[in-house]
Amino acid sequence: MINPSFKKLSEINNSRYALCVMVSKRARMLIDGKETKLKKAKAQPVTTALEEVMEKKVWEDKSNE
């Protein structure tokens, strides 16, 4: 299990809720068959999604707001 610091994640988005939603949506995409943007995917989709967000490989889609 990965335990990232909120300080590092707050550089991406200050809202914990928004980060949680972003990671969970990306994890769902990975479960549904989307390709990972990492060179080596982790076993768990949530861990992979979180690492993608931390490495800024995926970002929040604000077009629906």
UniProtKB/Swiss-Prot annotation:
It holds the Pfam family RNA_pol_Rpb6. One of its GO terms (molecular function) is DNA-directed RNA polymerase activity. InterPro entries: DNA-dir_RNA_pol_omega, Pol_omega/Rpo6/RPB6, RPB6/omega-like_sf. GO terms for cellular component: DNA-directed RNA polymerase complex. It comes from the Bacteria. Gene3D superfamilies: 3.90.940.10. Keywords: DNA-directed RNA polymerase, Nucleotidyltransferase, Transcription, Transferase. It catalyses: RNA(n) + a ribonucleoside 5'-triphosphate = RNA(n+1) + diphosphate. Its EC number is 2.7.7.6. GO terms for biological process: DNA-templated transcription. Transmembrane segments: none annotated. Promotes RNA polymerase assembly. Latches the N- and C-terminal regions of the beta' subunit thereby facilitating its interaction with the beta and alpha subunits. Belongs to the RNA polymerase subunit omega family. The RNAP catalytic core consists of 2 alpha, 1 beta, 1 beta' and 1 omega subunit. When a sigma factor is associated with the core the holoenzyme is formed, which can initiate transcription. This is DNA-directed RNA polymerase subunit omega. It comes from Finegoldia magna (strain ATCC 29328 / DSM 20472 / WAL 2508) (Peptostreptococcus magnus).
